[in-house]
């Protein structure tokens, strides 16, 4: 990031660690090419995100960033302004970098919610929803689910009791939804109450510990599993749920929809049906061939 990027082209990117699995560059650069937009989307793999890093991005002409593991909570803290999801849940996955200020957004929840509505809307109505994990993605997803008015009860299962209880408090305080932190043992004993499982931890991700978070015995044909890990296409958790007959929402759908919102924030251009269809096909082909 030492040299200034092309002044006529707009430059965006993704920041996180690790990023070898990321398909975000494929998504954004392909749409820029399809639409004839003079822009590029780069990869910035860094274990640290701080004010110095942000200033380096600004000095290099970076106008916007997708933010992923492990920087979503830090991204919110570094912003001067933030959307309502970021403000309430204290996590952001998108930064717009202006000359004098940084604006944070969270498109995770919107991407996840749209995926559920398209592929398994019934799972929101017939039972309770449990979110596995308490990181930045879990925060955004919990907020959008609570704000949707479609659910009454949310469970959160995480080994980090402190952050889990914080998320439950924020959701219960800012919505009409009761969110409860439960242990993995308690979750197993209440599995008949669950219709939708949303997995948000890195377990199963390419290059990470395989998991699964839950065994095949937990799932049944009346459940839907939404594993937001998209690379590989079938994680050990997805395979376990499939064996039990559960319905699957692929993580690539959330990646697709949250990226479409980021594209709009970055460029000011609303994605159309063709953009979504082409991107879905590219993701499917890439993940199938890996």
UniProtKB/Swiss-Prot annotation:
Pathway: Metabolic intermediate biosynthesis; chorismate biosynthesis; chorismate from D-erythrose 4-phosphate and phosphoenolpyruvate: step 4/7. GO terms for molecular function: NADP binding; shikimate 3-dehydrogenase (NADP+) activity. The keyword Oxidoreductase applies. Shikimate binds at residues 22-24, 68, 93, 108, 230. One of its GO terms (biological process) is amino acid biosynthetic process. Its EC number is 1.1.1.25. Keywords: Amino-acid biosynthesis, Aromatic amino acid biosynthesis, NADP, Oxidoreductase. SUPFAM superfamilies: Aminoacid dehydrogenase-like, N-terminal domain, NAD(P)-binding Rossmann-fold domains. It catalyses: shikimate + NADP(+) = 3-dehydroshikimate + NADPH + H(+). NADP(+) binds at residues 133-137, 228, 251. It is an enzyme of class 1 (oxidoreductase). The active site is at residue 72. One of its GO terms (cellular component) is cytosol. Gene3D superfamilies: Leucine Dehydrogenase, chain A, domain 1, NAD(P)-binding Rossmann-like Domain. Homodimer. Involved in the biosynthesis of the chorismate, which leads to the biosynthesis of aromatic amino acids. Catalyzes the reversible NADPH linked reduction of 3-dehydroshikimate (DHSA) to yield shikimate (SA). Belongs to the shikimate dehydrogenase family. This is Shikimate dehydrogenase (NADP(+)). It comes from Leptospira borgpetersenii serovar Hardjo-bovis (strain JB197). The gene is aroE.
């Amino acid at each position: 990031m030492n040299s200034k990027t092309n002044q006529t082209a707009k430059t965006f990117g993704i920041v996180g660690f690790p990023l070898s699995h990321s398909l975000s560059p494929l998504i954004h650069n392909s749409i820029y090419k399809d639409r004839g937009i003079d822009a590029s989307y780069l990869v910035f793999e860094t274990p640290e995100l701080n004010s110095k890093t942000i200033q380096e991005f600004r000095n290099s002409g970076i106008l916007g960033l997708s933010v992923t593991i492990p920087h979503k909570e830090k991204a919110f803290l570094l912003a001067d302004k933030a959307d309502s999801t970021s403000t309430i849940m204290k996590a952001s996955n998108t930064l717009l970098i202006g000359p004098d200020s940084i604006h944070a957004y969270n498109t995770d929840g919107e991407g996840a919610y749209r995926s559920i509505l398209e592929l398994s809307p019934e799972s929101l109505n017939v039972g309770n929803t449990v979110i596995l994990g308490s990181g930045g993605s879990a925060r955004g997803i919990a907020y959008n689910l609570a704000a949707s008015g479609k659910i009454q009860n949310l469970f959160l299962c995480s080994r980090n009791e402190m952050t889990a209880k914080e998320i439950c408090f924020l959701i219960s305080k800012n919505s009409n939804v009761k969110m409860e932190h439960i242990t993995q043992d308690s979750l197993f004993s209440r599995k008949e109450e669950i219709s939708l499982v949303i997995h948000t931890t890195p377990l199963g991700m390419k290059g990470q510990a395989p998991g699964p978070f839950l065994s095949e015995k937990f799932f049944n044909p009346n459940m839907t599993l939404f594993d937001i890990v998209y690379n590989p296409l079938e994680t050990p958790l997805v395979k376990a749920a499939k064996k039990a007959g559960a319905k699957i929402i692929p993580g690539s759908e959330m990646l697709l929809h949250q990226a479409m919102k980021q594209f709009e924030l970055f460029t000011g251009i609303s994605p159309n049906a063709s953009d979504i269809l082409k991107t879905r096909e590219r993701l499917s082909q890439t993940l199938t061939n890996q």
